[in-house]
A protein has these predicted regions:
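Short, structured helix-loop boundary elements
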Residues: 4, 153-156
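C-terminal regulatory
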Residues: 29-110, 115-140, 157, 161-190
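Short alpha-helical
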Residues: 8-9, 21, 100, 119, ...
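Intrinsically disordered, low-complexity regions enriched in Ser/Pro/Gly/Gln/His and often acidic
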Residues: 140, 151-152
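Central regulatory/effector-binding core of bacterial HTH transcription factors
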Residues: 1-30, 178-182, 187-188
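A short beta-strand structural signal in non-transmembrane regions
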Residues: 143-147
Length: 190
């Protein structure tokens, strides 16, 4: 069984025993109960539609951002404290269920936010999105492979070996970059 979770939701699924293995962004909650190995990092860019009022702005601070809507992916955690990434509190935020919806809304000019650079790359190259500099920089996000120790059967061992394969994370980033074309064309990404 494969689940899709976001932000703290993957860690919560592991701790609640709904899954045996996760690939998750950011460090897990304190208290452990799991083993986590970094598998790669992902760069994010702050982007707006080329038609958005912020597209031609200089370096953006909190005051400029306060006048516009942020678009953010919702944390799927049910029990853990929800995690927010790159948001200033008290702002108008449209929360969406997934990164695909976030990209589509940002392409439509409905708001701003950080996007994975490989995912935004095609739209940046064809001019539909513009990268804008912000005072509050988002550091690269580390991704982890994590599991509960002592519960390692043959299937979990196989998946751990497969997901540690050299070059796999880079292949995922390449595939992420390729999904933009299908999203922009209104197709479901594969």
């Amino acid at each position: 069984r494969v689940l899709s979770e976001s932000l703290s939701g993957g860690w919560e699924a592991l701790l609640d025993r709904r899954v045996d293995l996760i690939v998750a962004a950011g460090e897990g909650p304190s208290g452990g109960g799991y083993v986590a190995e970094p598998i790669g990092t992902l760069r994010f860019v702050f982007a707006v539609a080329s038609t958005h009022p912020l597209a031609s702005a200089g370096v953006l601070g909190a005051a400029e951002l306060a006048e516009h809507r942020a678009i953010a992916v919702a944390d799927s955690a049910r029990r853990l404290l929800p995690r927010t990434v790159g948001l200033l509190s008290g702002r108008d935020v449209l929360t969406v269920p997934d990164m695909r919806t976030k990209l589509l809304l940002q392409l439509a000019g409905a708001g701003y936010g950080f996007l994975p650079e490989p995912y935004a790359r095609g739209a940046l190259q064809d001019g539909r999105l513009r990268e804008v500099q912000v005072e509050t920089h988002k550091p690269d996000e580390t991704f982890y492979l994590a599991w509960r120790p002592g519960e390692e059967g043959e299937a979990l061992g196989w998946w751990r070996r497969a997901l540690r394969s050299e070059g796999l994370f880079d292949s995922w980033l390449h595939a992420l970059a390729a999904t933009y074309r299908s999203v922009a064309a209104g197709q479901s990404p594969r």
